[in-house]
Amino acid sequence: MKRLVTGLLALSLFLAACGQDSDQQKDSNKEKDDKAKTEQQDEKTNDSSKDKKDKKDDSKDVNKDNKDNSANDNQQQSNSNATNNDQNQTNNNQSSNNQANNNQKSSYVAPYYGQNAAPVVRQIYPFNGNKTQALQQLPNFQTALNSANNEANKFGSNNKVYNDYSIEEHNGNYKYVFSFKDPNANGKYSIVTVDYTGQAMVTDPNYQQ
């Protein structure tokens, strides 16, 4: 009987030990599974972070490419604008030059004598040279006449009337010679010259005819 009790006690201890070993094995296996899951989760997290970083780097590269393309587009646009501005400036200059030429042509007045002109400077300074060559060197006739008239009016009467003109040549340089009648003094004229630079000068304010 004592042996039976002893045997049962030993069997109970053995089974208890086996059960404890089984629980320990289960706990060990659970820890291994948890560790493996944690490592897998960490690996997934690392992979996800790496993917995000790669995507972020790709995004930076795309943004850099976009900035480079934008800079190139802006530079091309600037160059295009500069070219267009230069072309517009050239066109404006050409237009201005054409306008100036047209104004010159439209304002050109052929030399003429005053109404009922007496031969005053034509007798004093008869011109037998090349009139076309002289007129090419001299300023616009009407401009020169107006300048000479203003100069003549500075002496004596200030409402002198244009009479006649001639051309004088000296060492290849030409000048207009104008006469202006003083309506308040019978037979008196002012003689005024205008050189090729447009400078007007009274040479005789009281020429008597």
Swiss-Prot record:
Record keyword Magnesium present: no
Cell membrane found in the keyword field: yes
Residue intervals passing through the bilayer: none
Ranges of compositional bias, category Basic and acidic residues: 23-70
Cellular compartment(s): Cell membrane
Membrane topology: Lipid-anchor
Lipidation (S-diacylglycerol cysteine): C18
Chain intervals with Low complexity compositional bias: 71-105
Signal peptide positions (record): 1-17
This protein's UniProt keywords: Cell membrane, Lipoprotein, Membrane, Palmitate, Signal
Disordered as annotated region, ranges: 17-105
Cellular component annotations (GO), alphabetically ordered: plasma membrane
Chief place where the protein resides: membrane
Record lipid sites (N-palmitoyl cysteine): C18
Protein name, per record: Uncharacterized lipoprotein SAB2248c
Native organism: Staphylococcus aureus (strain bovine RF122 / ET3-1)
